[in-house]
Amino acid sequence: VGFTTINHIIWKYQFGVVTKKKFVTSHYHCLYVCKDDKQRKFFPFSRFKKEDKSENGRSLHYRDKEDVWDIKREYWTGDEKTPTKLPSEIIKKLLEYSSEKKDIVFDPFLGSGQTAVVSKSLNRRFIGFEIVPDYYKFAKKRLDKDMYRIKKTK
């Protein structure tokens, strides 16, 4: 397809599926790719300044850029469940580091439409493709009816 892999990010989540014959799966693989690495943007201080520290004195700037992300799942009472919906914080973090307002965000596997929803909330434009009819309908409904339901952070 012509994409360059920038990072292979691991999303570590709680409450994996417990099994009797193997280890519990409690992570998800996220590929961060771009079309043209020479024109790719990265804003290293978009979320934390170099001097920002956690309560235990660790650099927030450095920790935020590690490739294993411990981000809580999003649960909404009465929300339709889809296997493709990532927490908005994952997408928000990627977009804040890699794009500016009015940029176009492309998601070739749109799923539930979460990338489009978060892009819109951050004043980014978006293009997405989805070939699974049920996921397409779900994403279209969310976007058409402003059914965003994303967690507010910071």
Residue ranges of predicted features:
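Core catalytic lobe of class I
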Residues: 1-137
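S-adenosyl-L-methionine
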Residues: 140-154
